[in-house]
Regions:
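Two-component/phosphorelay signaling modules centered on CheY-like receiver
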Residues: 22-42
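Hydrophobic/aromatic residues positioned on beta-strands within the core alpha/beta folds
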Residues: 90-93
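A Lys-centered signature of the CheY-like receiver
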Residues: 113
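Acidic, metal-coordinating helix/loop segments flanking the phosphotransfer/catalytic sites
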Residues: 30, 43-61
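Short amphipathic alpha-helix used as the core "switch/output" element in two-component signaling
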Residues: 75-87
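Active-site residues of response regulator receiver
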Residues: 65-66
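Acidic catalytic/metal-coordinating carboxylates
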Residues: 46, 72-76
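Non-catalytic signal-transmission and effector/linker regions of two-component phosphorelay proteins
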Residues: 1-17, 24, 101, 116-138
């Protein structure tokens, strides 16, 4: 069963899940997302933690690193999350070539590390604006 965004998630504050194993980068992303008026409902550093937090927090957007070190794959976490939720995903990674293998979830956005704050903020806006669920709710 796929869950869609609620109208308040589309129209205003979006609940955001950050999947990132580096605490400083996770905090930086949390600050950037908060500056846009969205709410970070959870931060996860492993695949299993990300999936569990997505199920409990029901985010409207996911920002995900690909390589979670010993914590598994961000791609695997996102694939499992997208099996239950129809939400936009932005991959933020130092390994963008891993998304060129054809194994990435669709549709996704990609930002290479190191990133500029303006790039993250613009991509969050695009992901929420252009997502099919957001268009239907408008």
């Amino acid at each position: 069963m796929t869950t869609t965004l609620s109208p308040d998630q589309v129209a205003g504050t979006t609940r955001v899940l950050i999947i990132e194993d580096e605490p400083i980068i996770a905090l930086d992303l949390e600050n950037l997302v908060s500056e846009l008026g969205h709410k970070v409902v959870a931060t996860a550093s492993t695949r299993d933690e990300a999936v569990a937090k997505a199920k409990s927090e029901r985010p409207g957007l996911v920002l995900a690193d690909i390589n979670l070190g010993e914590g598994g794959s961000g791609i695997d976490a996102v694939n499992e999350i997208l099996a239950s939720f129809d939400i936009p995903v932005i991959f933020i990674t130092a390994y963008p070539e891993k998304l060129l293998t054809g194994e990435r979830p669709e549709p996704t956005y990609l930002i290479a590390k190191p990133f500029l704050p303006e790039t993250v903020q613009a991509t969050v806006g695009q992901a929420l604006f252009f997502h099919p669920v957001a268009k239907q709710a408008a």
